[in-house]
Amino acid sequence: TLESRGLGDVYKRQGLLIMVVPIWIIFASSTHSSLFINTNGLQFFLGDNFIDNYSRVLFKQSGFFNEITALKMFFNSFVMATGIATLSVITSLMAAYGLVYFKVKYATFIFWLIFITLLVPLELRIMPSYIVMSKLNLVNTFAGLILPISASAIATFFFRQFYKSIPDELLEAAKLDGTNSLRFFIDFLIPLSKTMIAAVFIFMFVFGYNQYLWPLITVSYTHLTLPTMQVV
């Protein structure tokens, strides 16, 4: 009804305000001097130090952290998040393809074994992962940041469920046309999976970008510092 629709709009606006206002207050406060904020508290309106504050933080090493600029830290996070998202999509695509389309013995058991890894806390895996990266001399490298968290059970689950929804007739028709397994994967499944690939990539990019605990342990070189390691 019109009344319920209007009430829904009110709730949407309230939800939007709850999400946006705190972010705006943080941004507005960042345009004031630290002395002003310490004296008067957080601010709702913009201050006079916008250009000075942000140019110092983004481009000057002394503005945020003594040996690296915020711009470099954002670049590090972007590289890490892109690497994690890309490798997660690739490994999950291939894992799901093998589990669904190859006659693998105990395929369902293997899938659930992969899926159960979601129940293993990150804290439990950190030290073994660090030891492996250390023995491979990958500590303080982008590879060391990316590889241990680039395989995703949840992404494999999404692709597996998507592949199981594709009719078996498509595979049979491809076989009749002489298409091998690799060509079927590249020419048929990947184009059909574009929407799912985009969704998983975005999900894993955000997951990688927001990493805190693993980079905190595996990075000691300042030039690899991430924003989350300085602001959390």
What feature does the model see in each segment?
Residues 1-11, 223-232:
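Single conserved hydrophobic/aromatic residue that forms the stacking wall/gate
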Residues 9-224:
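A structural signal for multi-pass alpha-helical bundles of membrane permease subunits
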